Amino acid sequence: MAARIAFYAPLKAPTHPTPSGDRQMARLLVRALQSAGAEVDLASDFRSYDGRGDRQQQQALQAEGRDLAAALIDGWRDLPEGRRPTAWFTYHLYHKAPDWLGPAVSAALAIPY
């Protein structure tokens, strides 16, 4: 069975409309994982970036991330085991764009992060 990888890029998703090096790297990593035989699903396009260091904005993003993680967990738990992710891959952790999804989802589904 091929690995099913939940891919997430909190700074900029590979599907983001604005070109950038981060978007290109995310796309290349997805392709590399697919070339290695993995099935890769974009877990979310949620962007947790706050460039100003605004405490209220960061708290709002954290709360939104917590809600999204809970929804992902519920959705994947409802799927047959063969359709759930077997690993979580986060590209580009950054203090201005933390991963509020991956650790919670990985722990809940007991998959590698």
Regions found by a protein language model. Give the residues of each.
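N-terminal subdomain of nucleotide-sugar transferases
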Residues: 1-48, 83, 111
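Short acidic, glycine/proline-rich loop/turn micro-motifs
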Residues: 16-17, 53-55
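A conditional alpha-helix N-cap/helix-loop micro-motif detector
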Residues: 22, 65-69, 95
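A generic structural signal for well-ordered alpha-helical segments
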Residues: 33, 105-106
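Extended, alpha-helix-rich binding/interface surfaces that flank or overlap catalytic cores
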Residues: 47-51, 59
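Glycine-rich, highly charged phosphate/nucleotide-binding loops
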Residues: 57-78
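Short N-terminal targeting/anchoring amphipathic segment
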Residues: 76-97, 111-112
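A short acidic, amphipathic alpha-helical/loop segment
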Residues: 100-104
